[in-house]
Amino acid sequence: MRCLALDIGGTKIAAAIVKNGEIEQRQQIHTPRENVVEGMHQALGKLLADYEGQFDYVAVASTGIINNGILSALNPKNLGGLAEFPLKASIAKHTDKPIGLLNDAQAATYAEYQLQNSEQVSNFVFITVSTGVGGGIVLNQILQTGSRGIAGHIGHTLADPNGAICGCGRRGCVEAIASGRAIEAVSSQWEDPCDPKEVFERFRKNDEKATALVERSAKAIANLIADLVISLDIQKIAIGGSVGLAEGYLSLVEKYLQDFPSIYCCEIETAKFGQDAGLIGAAYWVKDVLLDKPEGTIYG
């Protein structure tokens, strides 16, 4: 089956035909920044028209929370005016093909899980440490999306009850400590301020302040991993994102994991899919749901 896959992010919308896990005719446009609701309707309509007659179903990976086809977020400000946007209905105006939607981190998780031996790894987690911290959870070989679409928002578990206020409104979330945004919140206040990329450059040069800041992030992720393993019996975790894949970061996470009893640990690896993980994962997931639900019922 041919899939029109869409990956909707805060700054870009990627689209491609996905067939047998291969991406064709990929294009990318900017996410609307002005008149965002009407702009998004128009952008989706144009993308559907561009690929008309070339797909059998539509799969969407999107930032935020997808619940009954509606786009929302723990922090609505992250959507730039698109909170409560009728994403599925907007797409359905332009096609009668089946449509499936899920969160972009959930989609990336499903893509990464395709690389695993499901007989050996039935419980799997993907963690992305980037501007924010997100992820997805596979239990008993099934991607967990939840009744409200929020399953896998692991960046909003507690890291420090006395920590900074997170964008979601809660104090001390993992995201408020480990993310690129959290790193920059500290480094931008230094006498010699810098962005997260330079923080890691200084870290690799053994700068004391940068090292402490990166270690703080890595410790939070190590504790998150331990919590996931002990609560869900996770067998393997893949880590991605611009922070998660930064040179030296994963080894720090593994170092802090070694301080825990072994029962809190599992195999850790770097994520293999890059920027197209959402496109590929969404295409695979919706196809699998279609096969499992012959009547055509699609989640999202």
Curated annotation (Swiss-Prot):
Pathway: Amino-sugar metabolism; N-acetylneuraminate degradation; D-fructose 6-phosphate from N-acetylneuraminate: step 2/5
One GO BP: N-acetylneuraminate catabolic process
EC numbers on record: 2.7.1.60
Top EC class, one word: transferase
Reaction catalyzed: an N-acyl-D-mannosamine + ATP = an N-acyl-D-mannosamine 6-phosphate + ADP + H(+)
Residues engaged in binding ATP: 5-12, 132-139
GO molecular function terms listed in the Swiss-Prot or TrEMBL record: ATP binding; N-acylmannosamine kinase activity; zinc ion binding
Keywords on record: ATP-binding, Carbohydrate metabolism, Kinase, Metal-binding, Nucleotide-binding, Transferase, Zinc
Annotated residues for binding of Zn(2+): 156, 166, 168, 173
Record function comment: Catalyzes the phosphorylation of N-acetylmannosamine (ManNAc) to ManNAc-6-P.
NCBIfam families xref list: PRK05082.1
Quaternary state and interactors: Homodimer.
HAMAP family xrefs: ManNAc_kinase
UniProt similarity note: Belongs to the ROK (NagC/XylR) family. NanK subfamily.
Protein name: N-acetylmannosamine kinase
Species annotation: Haemophilus influenzae (strain PittEE)
Gene that encodes it: nanK
